[in-house]
Design a protein with these regions (language model features):
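Cys/His/Pro-rich metal-binding microdomains
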Residues: 64-67, 71-74
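Receiver (REC) domain switch/active-site residues of two-component response regulators
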Residues: 166
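Short glycine-rich anion-binding loops that position phosphate/pyrophosphate groups of nucleotides
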Residues: 114, 173-174
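N-terminal [4Fe-4S]-dependent radical SAM core
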Residues: 2-62, 75-81, 214-217
Length: 235
């Protein structure tokens, strides 16, 4: 597969992570980055039965490779598309076996950048829908914003994968917008998007997941009640 070159990056220089030359950026033009050119078919990790990567008990697949390179990304060790190990039929069969368990709600796609690994993920998601229908949900994180994915000229495989995804957490991680009270996100620019509802009107702003409940909405009032009752006083 072709190696990434300077031409794979736009000339702007916004929110670069470490080790990114000043001529490179994490703001790609429409269609500039593609799975066909960049993915090496590698995965970094597969984790079973987690409750941190979306709603309910989930299995999580971490694909390798991400050119967004966000500042203080917690997964910078797998920015390289060659990191990790090859995705195999054996791993796919294990994922399907785990998803068949009645207490597992669904699969989460992370990375790395899932939408630049569609060669792996499209067949997997198609198999999930074929064998489980909509009884198992699919979540995904992406560095792309919804608006970037909907713009004219973006590679069609990204939209094809989106059609199998139920919930998308979109946008780069922005260090200056970090908020530890956000649900399933690291920075306040990111959104939890209901993909099927949003695709009904792709030219409109995306529909936010109806179960969103950021902790910052509730903690101040709870803290105030605790203070009024004397809980937490040093005395």
């Amino acid at each position: 597969m072709a190696r990434i070159s300077l031409h794979d990056f736009s000339p702007a220089d916004v929110n670069r992570g470490p080790w990114i030359p000043t001529s490179l950026s994490n703001n790609p033009r429409a269609g500039q980055w593609s799975s066909e050119r960049m993915s090496q078919g590698m995965v970094a990790d597969y984790k079973r039965f987690l409750m941190t990567d979306g709603e309910g008990i989930r299995c999580s697949l971490y694909v390798s490779g991400c050119p967004f390179h966000c500042v203080e990304c917690y997964n910078e060790s797998i920015w390289d598309f060659r990191a990790g190990y090859p995705y195999t039929q054996k791993l796919e069969d294990q994922i399907m076996e785990d998803l068949a368990l009645p207490y597992v709600q669904g699969l989460t796609l992370l990375g790395g950048e899932p939408l630049l690994n569609t060669g792996i993920l499209l067949p997997l998601c198609k198999r999930i829908r074929s064998e489980f229908g909509n009884t198992k949900d699919i979540w995904s994180w992406t560095g792309y914003t919804w608006e970037e994915l909907m713009r004219k000229g973006e590679t069609p495989d990204k939209l094809e994968l989106l059609r199998y995804i139920d919930i998308l957490v979109d946008g780069r991680y922005m260090k200056n917008l970090h908020d530890s009270l956000l649900q399933f996100r690291g920075s306040s620019n990111q959104r939890i998007i209901d993909v099927p509802k949003s695709l009904e009107n792709p030219s409109e702003p995306p529909v936010i997941w109806e179960k969103l409940h950021d902790q910052e909405r509730f903690i101040p009032s709870i803290y105030g009640k605790d203070r009024a009752s004397g809980e937490g006083d040093a005395s």
